[in-house]
Amino acid sequence: MGCGMSRLAKATIALVILVMLFLPAAMAAASFDATRSQHLPLPRGTVRGPESVAFDGQGQGPYSGVSDGRVLKWNGDKLGWTTYTHGPGYDSKMCTATKFRPETATESQCGRPLGLRFDQKTGDLYIADAYKGLMRVGPGGGEATVLVNSVDGIPLSFTNGVDVDQTTGQVYFTDSSMNYNRAQHEMVTRTGDSTGRLMRYDPRTSDVTVLQSDMTYPNGVAVSTDRTHLVVASTGPCKLLRHWIKGPNTGRSEPFADLPGYPDNVRPSNKGGYWVALHREKNELPFGRDSHLLAVRVGSNGKILEEMRGPKSVRPTEIMERNNGKIYMGSVELPYVSVVKRK
């Protein structure tokens, strides 16, 4: 009996060791490499930074805002990119960057489109312009109209993320800081600035409601699939927040996910959950292996389900997944939109 117990104990210990060895791998998030990608190059010159990626109701696009203040539309390899919209009073000559006049010197006048989102029913494109505020342009493009540039008498300093409830047409958007603009974005993180706001615009009444104030670097925003809450990226703290817009918790915000990097835009995934673009990892080192996290897919429970990796030279600001399996990647630095195909 003593010998039998010894064998049982040994078998139990061996089983525990095997579980400890293999369970972490089984529980780890799936990962895929996005190093090899197709590029949709922006017009040659000094234009760069296709920060957000959007498609209209007919599946045309992508559309993306760039560093000279315009929103461009991709028309295929033959035609490439063409101007779709820009802010009021846009002067193409003055807004064209040169070696002696970088876009940072002109963007406060020319605008800097960040988040983009179509209302699929109306065809309207909503634009979160860092300097001009929340704008809208109708189907076909042209000059955009500024809808909101201040709320409760306080100017929008750093309009950033936007999403549209495709059922009601309500528009949700963020102002990342009352104290700093986009050109000073590093100060928002460095100082721990907590003056950001999450807002709602009603296109039927033009009313604007502040849903939450005193936020730390609110960035991208996404309406949940069931339309009960918003998922908001908090860049400096490397977190996602959940803000309830329906049900008994309406008006309440709570932590949703801790992230391994600094999040930018948040977009729904066709496989469930949300793709969160990571501008860079926490405590990322410039040397070593040329690979880092580009994005993570977070499930409805806040757990990381999937990781996307790629070279450190790529720092995405948005991940947009299409039904055909293609993933479009925006960047505030690169002169192209990346397209990755799932294997």
Spans of model-derived segments:
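Short loop/turn segments that connect beta-strands within beta-propeller blades
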Residues: 75-79, 138-142, 201-206, 244-249, ...
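Loop/turn-rich, solvent-exposed surfaces of beta-rich toroidal or solenoidal domains
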Residues: 258-309
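Beta-strand-rich domains and repeat architectures in extracellular enzymes and scaffolds
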Residues: 38-71, 314-316
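Asp-box/WD-like beta-propeller blade repeats and closely related beta-sheet repeat scaffolds
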Residues: 98-114, 120, 124, 128-189, ...
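A short helix->beta-strand "capping" segment at the edge of beta-propeller domains
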Residues: 25-49, 94-105, 303-305
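Surface loop/turn motifs at the tips and blade-to-blade linkers of beta-strand repeat domains
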Residues: 40-46, 85-88, 105-109, 147-154, ...
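Residue-level detector of Asp-centered blade-edge/turn motifs that repeat once per structural unit
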Residues: 56-59, 118-122, 164-168, 225-227, ...
